[in-house]
Amino acid sequence: MDWNFKSVAVVGAGAVGLYYGGRLAEAGEDVRFLVRSDFDVLKREGLKVESVHGDFVLPEVRVARTPEEIGPVDLVVVTWKATSNHLLPEVLPPLLHSGTQVLTLQNGLGNCEKIAAIVGAENVIGGMCF
């Protein structure tokens, strides 16, 4: 597994996705967020995070409404609620190239297996967040 990720897509731009994706973007990583409801706000106002670990503002964030707008990336971070996993077969393929890894930061059981059915078990990273 190659841990050198040059591009990242965050699928699920709620609290978890915006926090961890925002931290990666703050560190200088190329992060793109797949967004539904807050697209216009993020596009217009950027991202503001208030955290016990330090507040930060990203005046500009890369947001997209469809995975096709993002295109293939090195790392996909899935942070949406597991109840949306039925959409994975539509959402993941446009984000993949031959070396893409998929990290899941979701509650519940069976998430890695659902993702593995699409990308192969060798390309799945199961994660936890605090």
Language-model regions: role of each:
Residues 57-130:
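Rossmann-like NAD(P)(H) cofactor-binding subdomain of soluble oxidoreductases
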